[in-house]
Amino acid sequence: MVIETWKKSGIATKFPTYRNSAPVTVHSWQKGKRQDVEAEGLWRIKDGIYDFTEFIDKHPGGTFWIRETKGTDITEAFEAHHLTTAPEKMIAKYKVRDAYQRIYTLTLHEDGFYKTLKERVREKLKTIDKRPKRKSDVSDDL
C-alpha cells in the first residue's frame, strides 16, 4: 500500500530503500538515503557533490547535523535553512564535481515557486524594524 501511494505522488523516481521495511528507524532511513543518492560519502546539494569535511567545525548551525547527513542529499534542508544567498556562494569552494540526476522530482528552479517566494521573503525582511521594541513615549499622568 505504501509503495502504491508513493508511486502516485510523483515525489521521486525511485522508492526509497529501506523505507518500507520494519522497523523503520532514523538509522535505516539514513542508510537507505545514503544508498539511493550516490553521494559517495559526501554531501549532495542540487546537482553537485560537496566535501564539507573541513567546514564541519565552522558550520554556524553546529556540527551535529552536518555530520549526520554526510553521504546524503541535503538540497531541501539547505534551501529551507539558508534564506540569504551567502551560503550558496560560500559552498562553491567545497564542490567536488557535478552529480547525476536527482531521484527526487521536487524542483528548485531559479524562476520557480520556491525560489520566487524565498526572494520575496528576503526582500520583505529588509523592511522590518529589527531594533528592540521601544517603550511607549506616551505616559499617563494620573
From Swiss-Prot:
Gene Ontology molecular function: heme binding; metal ion binding
Transport recorded as keyword: no
Transmembrane stretches, start-end: none
Limits of the Cytochrome b5 heme-binding domain: 16-100
Cellular component annotations (GO), alphabetically ordered: mitochondrion
Top-level division of the source organism's lineage: Eukaryota
A Pfam family: Cyt-b5
Coiled coil: none
Family, per entry: Belongs to the cytochrome b5 family.
Function noted in UniProt: May play a role in muscle cell metabolism.
Descriptive protein name: Cytochrome b5-related protein
UniProt source species: Drosophila virilis (Fruit fly)
Gene designation: Cyt-b5-r
